[in-house]
Amino acid sequence: MDKERKKATMEKLRNSEAVYVIMSNCTRMPYVVCDSETYDDEVLVYYTEEDAKKTAEELRAENIPVQIAQVDKKQFLAFYNSLFPTGVNCIKVGKGTPDEIAIQLTELIIRPSDDTLPEGKVRIENPEFHLTALYFMQEFRRQANPQVTEEMKEMQEEMMTHYKEGRYIVAYQEEGEGKEMMLLKQKDGQAFQPLFTDFLEFQKFQQFHGGKMKTAAVEAGKIPDIMMPGAAGVTVNPFGVNLQLKIERKKA
């Protein structure tokens, strides 16, 4: 029976006209939650807008700022694939309804392996860091006066451990014979260099800014070497989790 339910659910996830996803206002990404029993890292998906609205209202009542995004059928594959770089492994369908069921992401779609990439190309992703950053910023930004609480310090330490293990994408423009790294100025006047956990996050940035940009891969430990003068640090995925990290430029 469970096997048939799962099969029917996956069929609906592939062929419904649309599904509705709970999105976090804190990260501009799907709201992620860790299942207390299975420890799956899940996103919440519904077949009807009404069911999604009910869950959104319940979360807002707990001071968790969320909204609903409609994902149309033609966007399904791109949406499901976009979950892999975030570290999410499970889709919780219909949470809080009689039809609630968990579907593993790898059961729903088959992702091409790294072996299928063109020669010389590598897949740059940081799912452990990205996922921890999503959890951290969901908690941090939901506060009226955002601060790192005692309960959040362990999560922050885990996040920074993953960050230091990572390899990232940086964007630059060619100026004459040199390279000009991108900088984003903040409202307070500080400037941060954008840093991307994966190519999808870089694409969001590129689509907004336009112009010709090139990319390079850089290990976390080498980032101080490429910091621009005047940069206060990096902003990770500025059109997503937008995590700002203070990093000092390496002295010449």
What are these regions (language model features)?
Residues M1-A252:
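An interfacial alpha-helical scaffold signature
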